[in-house]
C-alpha cells in the first residue's frame, strides 16, 4: 500500500488544478490497470483488502463497501475463461513434414488468443504463486513458425531439403505439368536455404514459372529433343526454321539467302559486260563506242594525231597519245620488269607479255 500512496497525488491537489471530467471511480480503475501492468516483485495477495485512494474527504462506510464490491475482481470467472498451458507442455506446431505434405499446407491459428505462444495465461501470470514462471525473466524462446513459410525454413530441426527437378517444358505428351509450372523430373537444381516457398521439396509451385523459360513455351511447334548425344541447346535452335530467315538473318543452313545477297564473280563479270557503251566515236566512218569517256578521248587522238605524252629520257623524242603507252616505253630505258613468272625465273615489262608466257606452261 505504500506504493499506492507514493504513486498517486492527493485528490485535493488534482482539484486545485481545475475541474476534471473524470470521477473517482475512473481514477480508481486507471490506478488498478497501471498496477496490473507494472507489478512489483510478486503477485498481489487475493486475501488483502482492495486498494483505495486516500482523500481528504473520506466517503461513508456504506459508499466505500459498495465501491469495493464493484471493483473486486471476479477471480472465478477469469480463471475459467483463461486457461494456462498444461504443465510441461511444449508449443504445438501444426506444420507437416515435407514428405507428408501433398499440397500447400498452412498451420491453423493458435487455439488461444491470450498471451504469446509458450507463455502462461494472463490471469495465471498475475495470480500464480511467487515462484511461477511468469515472474521470472523468460528464457530465450524459439520463434513461432510463420504461417506462410514451409517447415524447411523454420528454425526447428528439419530434414535436409531435397533438390527440385527442372527441365525444359515441351507441349508434347509426357511433358510434365502444364500451365507453366515446374516439372518434377529433368535437370536438378539444389534448393538453397533461402529459396522461395514454391522451390522447396514436397511443395508444388504456387506461381507460374519465371519468364526465362519463355523460349520453351512460346513456340508451339517444338518437339522433344531427339535421342542422341546430349549437347547444350542454343537459343537459335529453339526458334524453329521459319523465324531464322525473317528476323535474325540468314545462316549457313540457308543457301538460298546467300545466293540472293552475294552474287558470284561470274555474275559480276557478266553484269560489267552488259553495261551499255554510251560513248560513241563521232569521226566519219568510225562507229566505235566506249563505256568511259576517257577511253573515247584517247581513241579520238588516233584520228586527230595528237600525242600529248612525250618521253623525258635524254636523247629520246618519242611521243604517245596515251599515258600507259608512255609508261611501257619508259621501262625499256630503265630495264624494269615488274611482271615475273611464278613457274620460271623469267620477267616481263608488260602484263600482256606475261599472259602470253603463262600459256606455254599450260
Curated annotation (Swiss-Prot):
Changing residue 341 to Y: Found in a patient with borderline hemoglobin A2 levels; uncertain significance. GO terms for biological process: cellular response to peptide; erythrocyte differentiation; maternal process involved in female pregnancy; positive regulation of DNA-templated transcription; protein destabilization; regulation of DNA-templated transcription; regulation of transcription by RNA polymerase II; ubiquitin-dependent protein catabolic process. It comes from the Eukaryota. Residues 58-67 have a biased composition (Acidic residues). Belongs to the krueppel C2H2-type zinc-finger protein family. It is linked to Anemia, congenital dyserythropoietic, 4A: An autosomal dominant blood disorder characterized by ineffective erythropoiesis and hemolysis resulting in anemia. Circulating erythroblasts and erythroblasts in the bone marrow show various morphologic abnormalities. Affected individuals also have increased levels of fetal hemoglobin. This is Krueppel-like factor 1. The gene is KLF1.
